[in-house]
Structure formats: structure tokens, C-alpha cells
A protein has these predicted regions:
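Alpha-helical tetratricopeptide repeat
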Residues: 1-186
Length: 186
């Protein structure tokens, strides 16, 4: 009887603990905290958003989200090396932010560091899984630069299956197009 009562109390304790404990990660809390700046980026007010996230980084130097969004602003302002720095800082604080890998890969690609870009896109594909096709498309573009054409074609086909129209357009261009055989009339 005592064991049943203790088991029941333990289950009640677990239920209360589950519902009363905060389940948000630090990144989720930061996204909510920096909602104003994120909206500025979405509204394409990049300079204002950069100032916002620059202040956020100064006030919250341990915030991966602040570094990540400042890095995204740097990328949009074509400050690729600064973007790489900010995104590297964000990843060193929280290595689960998938967009950081994608953005850092784009920054590496923009400065013609294709091997590093491919590595970042590969990590982005792993983190994003099959939720967004742009990681597959960017990995394919980096693979083209590295002369990995067949793997690039597979990535582009995967991106097309996920709904990426840009990947479809890339598949219609060389080196993926094959010439049609010429039929001669005799």
C-alpha cells in the first residue's frame, strides 16, 4: 500500500514538475526578446536592424541570437568577413542554430571560399533536415564550384522535391542539361 501511495505521489510530482518548469531554450527566449530587430530585418530595414543588433550584442554578449541576426545584417550589407565573424561567434555560443550555418556558408561562398562554404551548407542541411530547400540548393551550388556535378544534381533534385523553383531553374542549365539527340531524316 505504501509503495502504491509513494508511486502515486511521485507521478503527481512529475506532472507538476512538467507543467511548471519553463521549457523554452535560451535561443527561444532571445528570439522573443529581439522580436523588434528581427521584424526590422524582415521589413528589409537592414541598417536600422544592424544598429539594433549591434546594441543587442553589446548589452548581451552571450546571446547567440543577437550575433546571428547581426551576422545576417552584415551578410545583407555585403560585409562578408564581418558576417563570418558574427556567425562564428553565434555558433560558438549555440551550435544548434541552423540558419547560422546556412548564412555562414553564403558568406564563405561570396568570398570564393567554396570548400568552407560546402562544409557549412552540409551542416545546414543536417540541421535543417527536409524543412527548407534552400540549404540543398546552396550546397549544390558549392558542389558545382568543387566539380561534384552528380552530387550537385542530386541536391538540386532534392530541393525541387521540397518546392524550390530556383533549383529547378538551375537544373535546366548546363552542366545538367543534356543535348537532345539529332534525328536525321533519310
Amino acid at each position: 500500500m505504501e509503495i502504491a501511495l509513494l508511486s502515486l505521489l511521485f507521478v503527481v510530482y512529475l506532472v507538476f514538475r512538467y507543467y511548471l518548469i519553463d521549457h523554452e531554450t535560451a535561443a527561444d527566449k532571445d528570439v522573443r526578446r529581439f522580436e523588434k530587430g528581427i521584424q526590422l530585418v524582415k521589413d528589409r530595414k537592414i541598417e536600422t536592424a544592424f544598429d539594433y543588433f549591434n546594441d543587442a550584442v553589446l548589452k548581451n554578449p552571450k546571446s547567440a541570437v543577437a550575433y546571428a541576426w547581426r551576422g545576417k545584417c552584415q551578410l545583407n550589407l555585403a560585409n562578408h568577413h564581418s558576417a563570418i565573424y558574427d556567425l562564428t561567434q553565434a555558433i560558438s555560443i549555440d551550435n544548434t542554430l541552423a540558419d547560422c550555418y546556412l548564412d555562414r556558408g553564403i558568406a564563405f561562398y561570396s568570398v570564393d571560399q567554396f570548400t568552407e562554404a560546402f562544409r557549412e551548407f552540409d551542416k545546414a542541411v543536417w540541421h535543417i533536415r527536409d524543412e527548407r530547400p534552400d540549404a540543398y540548393r546552396w550546397r549544390a551550388v558549392a558542389r558545382i564550384q568543387l566539380r561534384q556535378i552528380s552530387q550537385a544534381e542530386n541536391d538540386l533534385r532534392r530541393a525541387v522535391l521540397l518546392g524550390d523553383e530556383d533549383a529547378f531553374q538551375l537544373l535546366r542549365q548546363p552542366p545538367f542539361t543534356r543535348p537532345q539527340p539529332v534525328k536525321s531524316k533519310r
